Amino acid sequence: INLDITQQQDYAAPARAIYWGARQIMMEIGRLDPGDIIDYQINKKGFTYALLTGGTGNDESRFIPPMRGQFYDIVPFWTTEPTVRKVYKVNIPMEKEMQFQFYQGECTSSMRYEDGRKAYTFVSTDIMPTRREPNMVDLFDAAPKLMMSSTPRWQDKSLWFNKVNEDYGSFSAIPEAQKKVDELIQGKKTEMEKIAVLTHWVADNIRYSGISMGKGEGYTLHNLKMNYTDRCGVCKDIAGTLIAFLRMAGFEAYPAMTMAGSRVESIPADHFNHCVAVVKLSSGTYMPLDPTWVPFCRELWSSAEQQQNYLPGVPEGSDLCLTPVSAPENHYVRIKANNRLDAKGTLTGQFTITAEGQSDSNIRRIFTTGWQSQWQAALESQLLAVSPKARLIS
């Protein structure tokens, strides 16, 4: 049965916290009986991730990638449904070079010359759905995937990320923000005191809500004027606000891309889902900062994301970096209890909990994920997890 693709429907994609006007194309295929196979083909042009608005079918400029002249793709070869055959094919100009690697599985691959161009083809057959396990790593770290990129080195991606935001003026100072920075760092004597107060202010005052800036959205950090006026943005805009604040305080700071939840391979494909900041300390080393995760957290970088790859967009260019390991003693939990067991076997007492780092953040989360009126119920639920007979006295 050949489906009439003219019957497809174009809908606004569901959105939560990020409102960039994404669309989704949906089509009804009808009832499927055992043994039926869906055979479909998707054609892509230009670059992997795009927020295309306006333009006509002949407007080729819409397909120019942000990193002009470069192509990358990240292709999951795992499936959620039994799949007879999956084919991925990319056609590039003869003069372009492409590096690729297939991870965590096998496929049939080839490169052929077709009509004066290079055609790379990757085929996998008889694919069964990947079985998930409790608390397993991300599927990108465990299941078959293809990574490819025409960009030679990570340094090239780093230089591009630096230039595209500097050229746009993402971190240009504005008087009203400079006044706030001067107010925040007044009386702060050390560089870490200044970095901490600026990071926490941005984290607590720029809420996570993404509004599209139009052209350039998705890879360009909103400028400080927009962020400080709207007091909202996604991770890149929150990081951009912090970078501008740090620069107004006299620091050297830049944006960085990272991948929360899975590793980034050596192939310089844009496998990132999060934006953070780096600040150069007096020692000359760069320190990562994550204002998106700092609210209700005593840390300046979430230690839940240790040994995580990130790429700073610095003027000298950077290779892929790795976030540092945080020692266990930075995340202690200490419970001091004073209890009394009576003759009837009832244990009564009080205890004090002190914590640091991510342990502190986890305890705070009991109180920060709900209303203040729910605090007592939240504490009672913690006690009931220990014993169904426990009661919160005060």
Residue ranges and their predicted role:
Residues A22, D33, T83, D115-R117, ...:
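Short, solvent-exposed loop/turn segments at the edges of secondary structure
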Residues I1-P82, T121, R153, A327-S394:
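Lumenal/extracellular ectodomains and adaptor appendage modules
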Residues R23-E28, V181-K189, L224-C232, R364-T368:
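Second-shell loop/turn segments in exported
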Residues Q41-G57, P65-G216, A343-F367:
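Secretory-pathway-linked proteins and extracytosolic
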Residues K236-S326:
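Hydrophobic/aromatic-rich core segments of domains that either
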Residues Q178-K179, G214-K225, M259-G261:
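Short, conserved phosphate-binding/catalytic loop or strand-edge motifs used
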Residues A196-V197, V202-A203, H222-C232, I238-M248:
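Active-site-proximal cofactor/substrate-binding loop regions of enzyme domains
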Residues G30, T125, A203, I238, ...:
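Generic beta-strand/beta-sheet core signal
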